[in-house]
């Protein structure tokens, strides 16, 4: 499994549920080549469910520089390949718990492009500050323990 891109902003802006889903993406050949060289952006992208089908919106895949023929829209809506029971499960959670679905990372699994998605709830500003404080405190503790162990 080779990770191409991770949506780091998602971990900061959203509180994620533990269950994550793996979805395939319906792409063109030149889009796959472009993803392979890392020309992809997940910022501001989200998953939209319509008519029992899942779509990813605002995922930007830049044009492959060596492609001669196919011109495509870089921000086009792409269909996600999920099992029907997973789509129904996600749709029910969105309705009942007021959650949103966001992409976490894009990776290759046996030469197939996969997308890891998760249900999430947006964090408020004070929650983001508290998360940063906790992270800084953990870093300080690790540094002091490391220095203490080196002195002995």
From Swiss-Prot:
**Known SUPFAM superfamilies for this protein?**
Small protein B (SmpB)
Give the protein family.
Answer: Belongs to the SmpB family.
Gene Ontology CC terms, in alphabetical order:
cytosol
Keywords of this entry: Cytoplasm, RNA-binding
Asked whether the keyword RNA-binding is assigned, the reply is yes
Q: What's the domain of life for this entry? A: Bacteria
NCBIfam families membership: PRK05422.1, smpB
The record's Gene Ontology biological-process terms are: trans-translation
Q: What is its main location?
A: cytoplasm
Q: Name one GO molecular function term.
A: RNA binding
Q: What does this protein do?
A: Required for rescue of stalled ribosomes mediated by trans-translation. Binds to transfer-messenger RNA (tmRNA), required for stable association of tmRNA with ribosomes. tmRNA and SmpB together mimic tRNA shape, replacing the anticodon stem-loop with SmpB. tmRNA is encoded by the ssrA gene; the 2 termini fold to resemble tRNA(Ala) and it encodes a 'tag peptide', a short internal open reading frame. During trans-translation Ala-aminoacylated tmRNA acts like a tRNA, entering the A-site of stalled ribosomes, displacing the stalled mRNA.
Location(s), subcellular: Cytoplasm
The protein's name is SsrA-binding protein
């Amino acid at each position: 499994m080779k990770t191409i891109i991770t949506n780091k902003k998602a971990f900061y802006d959203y509180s994620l549920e533990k269950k994550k889903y793996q979805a395939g993406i319906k792409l063109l050949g030149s889009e796959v080549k472009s993803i392979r060289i890392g020309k992809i952006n997940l910022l501001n992208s989200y998953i939209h469910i319509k008519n029992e089908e899942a779509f990813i919106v605002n995922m930007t895949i830049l044009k492959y520089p060596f492609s001669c023929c196919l011109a495509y829209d870089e921000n086009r809506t792409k269909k996600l390949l999920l099992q029907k029971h997973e789509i129904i499960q996600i749709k029910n959670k969105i309705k009942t718990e007021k959650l949103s679905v966001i992409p976490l990372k894009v990776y290759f699994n046996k030469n197939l492009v996969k997308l890891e998605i998760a249900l999430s709830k947006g964090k408020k500003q004070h929650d983001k500050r508290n998360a940063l404080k906790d992270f800084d405190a953990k870093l300080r503790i690790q540094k002091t323990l490391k220095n203490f162990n080196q002195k002995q």
